[in-house]
Amino acid sequence: MYQNSEAGSLGRVVKGSWSDEEDDLLRKCIQKYGEGNWKRVPERAGLNRCRKSCRWRWLNYLKPSIKRGHFNEDEVKFIIQQHKLLGNRWSLIAAKLPGRTINDVKNYCNTHLYKKHSIENIPAPATNTMTHNTSSCVERPESSAAIKEPTWWENILVELQREEKEGKSQNCSGLDFEQDNLGQQDPNINDGMDQWLNSLREVPNLSYQWEENLLDFDVVNLWA
């Protein structure tokens, strides 16, 4: 009360919680002058409160006809119906519910209806989690662009290895050839070398100068 009297002497409006003495002054004013004309209530009641604060205190806390407790089923249906039509205009909705305050209607919608609506709209969690995990771990084949093309020198190595294997097989099978043929040059001895040189000509990245150097080799000495 000391704070309120000091604020009144200085002409300031008091904010914050109401005291018991202020509640009594507001009750007496409403009983004498009735509800309405809230602009003159602070002056008539001798309160350093704004008209909005006086109206809010009376309608939500001090009015004798206020009904406390849980909302029944009919009241809940009515609130839902009116909220679809009026939106968040709580004062209009509460005015149509006898004994219910604006605060009670607003708090009920915020704590019950909105919460229930948000829970119902939450999507159900996925049940087949193993399928999701295994599908994400499946290795994907590499694209055709990522497959490495063999280079020209790799082709040469493969060709040389193949010819080396063919030469070994010919040496193993040549143990039974006639003794008279020793020392004679096989006319087809250079077929493998010709085939190898032809493969080199087909490689686009092989330089022309290097190909001529290969052709200058002594073919007979190379295969001797």
UniProtKB/Swiss-Prot annotation:
Q: Could you tell me which residues form the DNA-binding region?
A: 38-62, 90-113
GO cellular component, alphabetical, reads:
nucleus
**What protein does this entry describe?**
Transcription factor MYB1
Keyword Transcription regulation (UniProt): yes
Q: Does the keyword Transferase apply?
A: no
Which branch of life, at top level?
Answer: Eukaryota
Q: Where in the cell is it found?
A: Nucleus
Role, per record = Activates DODA1 and CYP76AD1 in the betalain red pigment pathway.
Coiled-coil zones: none
Limits of the HTH myb-type domain: 10-66, 67-117
Q: What induces it?
A: This recessive y allele is expressed at low levels, resulting in an inner white flesh of the beet. However, yy plants still can make pigments but never make as much of it or have it in the same location as YY or Yy plants with an inner red flesh.
UniProt KW keywords: Activator, DNA-binding, Nucleus, Repeat, Transcription, Transcription regulation
